[in-house]
């Protein structure tokens, strides 16, 4: 639905200070939905192979989980350094803990609304993935395939 797509573009702009619309235009991508999941697919592919079935194509933007939209790890990794909002920097003492896929339980920053999905980076501004703000911790959203 066009109104849902526009709503998503606006949501990304408001929450992360990032123009997804500009990326779509500059990289010649189109938003494509499959169930509750959104993908960024090259326009050239759609122009030439629009009727072909697919199981995996393009970059996963994210998906709805209930009423919340969760950006994919791949999208955060690729574009998170360009975000202006929704970024949380973790102290170096938690870096190994985070990369092992564990949550950070000593959350001292209470400025985030519970349930917010943030881009997590380290003190050197390296993007580490996504995290979900909970009442007592930051839930690590790092996919298991990246846990070391």
Q: How should these model regions be labeled?
A:
Residues 1-148:
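Polybasic, low-complexity RNA-engagement segments
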